[in-house]
Amino acid sequence: MLSMKKILLALISIPIFLNAAEYQLSTHILDINSGQPASNVKVELYSLDKNQQWIKISEKFTEKNGRISDLLPYEKTENRPSGIYKLKFYTKDYYMSRKVDSFYPFVEVSFELSKDQKHYHVPITLSPFGYSTYRGS
């Protein structure tokens, strides 16, 4: 039988999960030169406004596992962002910190989000002289 303390803890936790923001966008960088996740890479998120100007939304750094999972929050399905966005990955800074020469000072990946999709994952595989991207899940 569950103790009263466990039941109360479970009941108190419910509102936290109900109000937690979901994230429509995540990214991941794999450094194929080293075979490791690329940690501490600065990544900026931009949206394209109606005047065709890029507006910076956020700036984050990849975690130790090379991921950023909390880009572009929304609270309700009807509030999901849509439109054209881009991620700007500061790859030269990453390779300079490892004392490795690289060709690309940064990598920009543009993409379009739809309100119909719950989540988008935009990973890149990276080397000092090349990169690749695809729509992940």
Q: For the regions a protein language model found, what residue spans apply to each?
A:
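Short beta-strand/loop motifs in extracellular/secreted proteins, especially
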Residues: 39-43, 120
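Positively charged n-region of N-terminal signal peptides that target proteins for export
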Residues: 1-7
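Beta-strand-rich interaction surfaces with strong enrichment in secreted/lumenal proteins
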Residues: 57-61, 76-77, 108-112
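Beta-strand-rich domain onsets/edges
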Residues: 9-39, 47, 54, 132-133, ...
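Short Pro-Gly-centered beta-turn/loop motif in secreted/extracellular proteins
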Residues: 69-83
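Beta-strand signatures of extracellular beta-sandwich domains
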Residues: 42-46, 86-88
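Short, acidic Ser/Thr/Gly-rich low-complexity loop/linker segments typical of extracellular
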Residues: 51-71
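Feature of secretome-associated and extracellular-like proteins
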Residues: 82-137
